[in-house]
A protein has these predicted regions:
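Surface-exposed, charged secondary-structure patches
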Residues: 6-13, 39-96
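Short beta-strand edge/turn micro-motifs at domain boundaries
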Residues: 96-122
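Hydrophobic residues in well-ordered beta-strands that form the structural core
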Residues: 30-31, 42, 114
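Short secondary-structure capping/turn micro-motifs that flank functional sites
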Residues: 38-39, 121
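Short, low-complexity N-terminal intrinsically disordered segments enriched in polar/charged residues
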Residues: 1-28, 32-36, 48
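Short beta-strand segments enriched in hydrophobic/aromatic residues
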Residues: 34, 89-91, 116-117
C-alpha cells in the first residue's frame, strides 16, 4: 500500500464518494467521483460480461432505498498522476463485489476513469 500522502487521501476521498453515493442516494457524488467519459466492465453473478458508460448507471445507483454499501479499501497504489484502488464492496441490494478503480489526476483533480468488477460470494 502506498504511504499516506495528500494524494493518497485525495484518491481515497474520491472512491469514498462512490460508496457514499449509494448510501446517500446521491447522483452528485457519482458525478464528482467519475470522469464524464468513464466506462465500467463487470462480470455478473451469472458469468455474463456487461459494459457501458458508467454515467448510465448513476440514476439506478442513486434510486432509493439505500444500497447499504459497506466498502473496504484492499489496496491503493499511486504513481505520478495515475492510481489504482481495489475495493471490497458488499451491499444489501447486490451482494458482494470486488471493484478495481483506475484513476487519473486531470488538471489537478483525481477522477475515476474506469471500473472493472466481478461478483463474488459473501
Amino acid at each position: 500500500m502506498t504511504a499516506r500522502t495528500d494524494d493518497y487521501d485525495a484518491i481515497v476521498r474520491v472512491v469514498q464518494l462512490y460508496i457514499d453515493g449509494f448510501n446517500d442516494n446521491d447522483v452528485g457524488k457519482f458525478k464528482e467521483a467519475f470522469h464524464e467519459d468513464a466506462w465500467m466492465f463487470y462480470i455478473n453473478v451469472d458469468g455474463s460480461l456487461y459494459k457501458n458508460p458508467i454515467s448510465k448507471s448513476f440514476e439506478n445507483w442513486a434510486a432509493p432505498p439505500s444500497w447499504g454499501v459497506v466498502g473496504r479499501f484492499m489496496s491503493v497504489t499511486q504513481v505520478g498522476d495515475a492510481a489504482a484502488v481495489q475495493l471490497s464492496f458488499d451491499s444489501e441490494k447486490s451482494g458482494g463485489w470486488i471493484d478495481f478503480h483506475n484513476l487519473l489526476r486531470i488538471n489537478g483533480v483525481w477522477k475515476i476513469t474506469n471500473k472493472s468488477a466481478t461478483h463474488c460470494s459473501r
